[in-house]
Amino acid sequence: MNKTIDITLSPHWEDRISNEQKLRRNDQRSVFQRDRARILHSAAFRRLQAKTQVHGPGSANDFYRTRLTHSLEVSQIGTGIVAQLKLRQPEFRHLLTSTSLMESICLAHDIGHPPFGHGGEIALNYMMRNHGGFEGNGQTLRILSKLEPYTEHFGMNLARRTLMGVLKYPAFLDQVHSKYRPDDVTNLRHLKSIEWHPPKGIYRDDESILHWITAPLSEADKTLFSTFRFQKENDKVHKKTRFKSIDCSIMELADDIAYGIHDLEDAIVMGIVTRNQWQESVASKLAECGDEWFEAHINNIGDKLFSGLQYQRKDGIGGMVNALLTSITIQKSTFEEEQSFESELLKWNAYLSPSMSYALNILKKFVGQYVIHNSEMQRIEYKGQQIVMEIFDALNSDPERLLPENDKREWREAKESGTNHHRIIADYIAGMTDGYAQRLYNQLFVPI
């Protein structure tokens, strides 16, 4: 058995930004069990059932996954990763103590994504281009820490470690944005989505919450945590952050596995991809990926996936998920020759083996090529993009007339205090489901 690594975490990782005096008789739940309950029972989480994952709600086929079912599957995979890591590397068991923590992080990871998937995200980023931008992960942190009405001012008031776990990109959007900025369009229908993909990060409006989350870190760790990946100089490419907590690294792997495999299952069932496409773009490459399991079983997996029999397809999907999940190990987040983190939460991350990382990238690229960038999917995304931009334009033209009362009050308060009142409009639209946004669009623009 491997020697246990001495891991001592500061008790401040279980702190909440606001002390609570809840009337809860004989409540024996842990901090992270309470976090999980808050997320699961939140309105923002429930709304994920009517938000686009890949195939929008209202599709002709009800088999597809929504943001909500995707989040549930990410949670299941994430806790599975934790369980196998505890067995495979028991020396880290004191770092991976809580299943509820991982469930909380995974359930919450997509909670800030707007209606109509990436089309909605691009639309809001364009409309907020002069007011701090918009990005789904940054919106997730904002909902959890400010917007969800579990408390008056602090959102769900989650534990610091939970918030650190959803912090995939610990930098502000203006720090990672490319130097190049496209010209504004004169007609919203002419907006090219490829030019307005947001960088990954959080809003300047939420600077105080980032400082609170990272408060237990040493100054050296804070500096290292904020560094970017090395990349060639290119004025048109956004920078990317390099580091995240171990909890976040597990969630991100679970998210990637769910995207690469479960979204593939949706595409097979709905007839979007064919056996020939699978063979050419995936099977032929995985047969030589360097992993013994994939090389030995890839042909059999293809037979199962395209057999037309649900139990066979499920067996093939489950086999791939298991193969990826069981190839994950905990390693240092920095190179040997580099300075390492002092905090154990940042010193270690979860990683796929190189061959399995290659295999997962092949699967993700396949989903991207044949599903996400499928012309039919892109038309749906374009339509959603137009709906979101038109709604924003209307609300921003006369907020006092068109915003709901609560949002109108917040907009007034922001404007009077000199803070970013445009963010209130973005928050309102980002919280909409696909269906609600469509109905509001019809109410505003479709003749009676």
UniProtKB/Swiss-Prot annotation:
Q: Tell me which Gene Ontology terms the entry assigns under biological process.
A: dGTP catabolic process
Family under the similarity heading: Belongs to the dGTPase family. Type 2 subfamily.
**Database matches in Pfam families:** HD, HD_assoc
Organism lineage:
Bacteria, Pseudomonadati, Pseudomonadota, Gammaproteobacteria, Vibrionales
Q: Which domain of life is it from?
A: Bacteria
Domain annotation HD: ranges: 67-260
- For this UniProt record, give its keywords in alphabetical order, as a comma-separated list: Hydrolase
Gene Ontology terms, MF aspect: dGTPase activity
What's the protein called, per UniProt?
Deoxyguanosinetriphosphate triphosphohydrolase-like protein
Q: Which InterPro entries match?
A: dGTPase, dGTPase-like, dNTPase_2, HD/PDEase_dom, HD_domain, PHydrolase_assoc_dom
Q: Which HAMAP family does the UniProt record give? A: dGTPase_type2
